[in-house]
């Protein structure tokens, strides 16, 4: 006969932040007697779920994917943009082995260093600060032939904003004494992801042959001509930029080509056209034998050196529980099921041994303001049954309502969503009390606490950077202030009497009074 468990439940209230301003604050205006009572009776604080505290740029609002990765891994997991920017600031970037090898191989072969990527300050697929650091590093290591192939943005930036970036890089190369912009083309062509190979081929031919619709002696001139043709940045036609002698710079055998996009989805196709031996998306007139490097990992089947490989998160909470022979349950609705499983487990799809999963279908409605309670009652039925079974040591549950209804911008519906979740929490807490269990109530990021944009007066449908609640319903305890999401996993391990692995850099926030 199995021993009855006294479960510890982690209840993640998605999109549930704390905001001092009560105006258009659905969480404040909701009738939440259960949470009000728990906050009055039990220790609680606020923790951070945004910005640098979760591995995002300073001030950047949190999101569900990042939030659950931090919650489950017990460490701040730097997202690619932040990770690379931090490496540049710490002067680690210039020593990156994959990048150094590429530059050095080109220099040794008497070749050129070609740098391509989305020249943008948008920070979604790339960042021009990363491209600048690469140009500086190449010249610092002795490269005299450095060529930038600029893909222009206009989607994650204003439609006609590339002039500032192009002018900056012209000035940069003048300052460095080496290098120049060799070509420009809109991301519509270079960064297609829908197998429209006729678009990608134009970028490939531009870089490998200098084959272009237009040719200019200056990148800004080329851009201005594109605007005259009524082409915004995203759609700029292939334009080769010549040097003082009227020559174009093309990718040759022995050269290096470094792709500076950090987001994978729109980087895969053009990468495959450069490196796949059996590529058949379009006919390649030339296939240079060069040293190709990707900034991050684009896909498992793309065989090229990677400057910043994906971090393999070991000893996440789920893995530690498995190693210690503990049982665990992950439960949520469809909308957040991946978050309490795949993302909480650090990007691992398969369940750990001893990990059960329950998926509750989210309601089939056009938008969730039409059913703000979503499937919370059914979810709670299953959760209460799991608690009463005394089968699990740790239960991870996500209530999606605050986030999914918050995204609709419907204030009244968001209030109802919060009230539905509050009622569910009451049932969960009662069930835990009957079996001697405990729970932590927190959130992954804010949303429903701000339903109107104070500046424009329009609906605020995005996440926020507000702090999120952290409540411990259990033994007599104190809670440290100033916590963040990555402190939650170490806290759980401490509460169930397990050691915190070295990989977890978060700190336990709850201290039981003996």
Curated annotation (Swiss-Prot):
Listed SUPFAM superfamilies: 2,3-Bisphosphoglycerate-independent phosphoglycerate mutase, substrate-binding domain (SSF64158), Alkaline phosphatase-like (SSF53649)
The active site consists of: 64 (phosphoserine intermediate)
Task: Spell out the molecular function terms from Gene Ontology.
Answer: manganese ion binding; phosphoglycerate mutase activity
- List positions binding substrate: 125, 155-156, 187, 193, 263-266, 336
Pfam families (UniProt xref): iPGM_N, Metalloenzyme
Q: List positions binding Mn(2+) 2.
A: 14, 64, 444-445
At the top of the EC hierarchy, this enzyme's class is: isomerase
Q: Does the keyword Manganese apply?
A: yes
The cross-references to HAMAP family, in alphabetical order and at most eight, read: GpmI
Q: What is the recorded name of this protein?
A: 2,3-bisphosphoglycerate-independent phosphoglycerate mutase
| Organism name | Shewanella baltica (strain OS185)
Upper classification of the source organism reads:
Bacteria, Pseudomonadati, Pseudomonadota, Gammaproteobacteria, Alteromonadales
């Amino acid at each position: 006969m199995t021993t009855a468990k006294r479960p510890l439940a982690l209840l993640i209230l998605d999109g549930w932040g704390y905001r001092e301003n009560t105006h258009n604050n659905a969480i404040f205006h909701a009738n939440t007697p259960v949470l009000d009572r728990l906050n009055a009776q039990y220790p609680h604080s606020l923790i951070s779920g945004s910005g640098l505290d979760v591995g995002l740029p300073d001030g950047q609002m949190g999101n569900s994917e990042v939030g659950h990765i931090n919650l489950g891994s017990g460490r701040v997991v730097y997202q690619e943009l932040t990770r690379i920017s931090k490496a540049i600031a710490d002067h680690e970037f210039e020593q990156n082995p994959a990048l150094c090898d590429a530059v050095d191989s080109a220099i040794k072969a008497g070749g050129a260093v070609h740098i391509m990527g989305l020249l943008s300050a948008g920070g979604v697929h790339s960042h021009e600060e990363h491209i600048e650091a690469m140009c500086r590093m190449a010249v610092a290591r002795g490269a005299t032939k450095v060529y930038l192939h600029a893909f222009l943005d206009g989607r994650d930036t204003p439609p006609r904003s590339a002039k500032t970036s192009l002018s900056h890089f012209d000035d940069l190369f003048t300052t460095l004494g080496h290098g120049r912009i060799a070509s420009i083309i809109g991301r519509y062509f270079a960064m297609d992801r829908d197998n429209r190979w006729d678009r990608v081929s134009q970028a490939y031919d531009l870089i490998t042959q200098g084959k272009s619709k237009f040719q200019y002696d200056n990148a800004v001139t080329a851009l201005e001509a594109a605007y005259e043709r009524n082409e915004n940045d995203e759609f700029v036609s292939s334009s080769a930029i010549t040097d003082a002698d009227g020559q174009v710079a093309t990718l040759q055998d022995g050269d290096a080509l470094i792709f500076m996009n950090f987001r994978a989805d729109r980087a895969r196709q053009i990468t495959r056209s450069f490196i796949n031996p059996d590529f058949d998306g379009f006919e390649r007139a030339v296939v240079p034998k060069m040293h190709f490097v990707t900034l991050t990992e684009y896909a498992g089947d793309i065989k090229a050196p990677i400057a910043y490989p994906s971090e393999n998160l070991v000893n996440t909470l789920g893995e530690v529980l498995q190693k210690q022979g503990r049982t665990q349950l992950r439960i949520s609705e469809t909308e957040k099921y991946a978050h309490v499983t795949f993302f909480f487990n650090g990007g691992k799809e398969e369940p750990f041994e001893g990990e059960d999963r329950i998926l509750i279908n989210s309601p089939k409605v056009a938008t969730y303001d039409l059913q703000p309670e979503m499937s919370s009652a059914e979810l709670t039925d299953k959760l209460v049954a799991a608690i009463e079974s005394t089968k699990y040591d740790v239960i991870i549950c996500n209530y999606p309502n605050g986030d999914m209804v918050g995204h609709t911008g419907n204030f009244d519906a968001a209030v109802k969503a919060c009230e539905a979740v509050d009622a569910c929490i009451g049932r969960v807490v009662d069930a835990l009390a009957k079996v001697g269990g405990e729970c932590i109530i927190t959130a992954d990021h804010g949303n429903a606490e701000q339903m109107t944009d104070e500046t424009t007066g329009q609906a605020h449908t995005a996440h926020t950077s507000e702090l999120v609640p952290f409540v411990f319903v259990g033994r007599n305890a104190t809670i440290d202030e100033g916590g963040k999401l990555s402190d939650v996993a170490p806290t759980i391990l401490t509460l169930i009497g397990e050691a915190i692995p070295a990989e977890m850099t978060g700190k336990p926030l709850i201290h039981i009074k003996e």
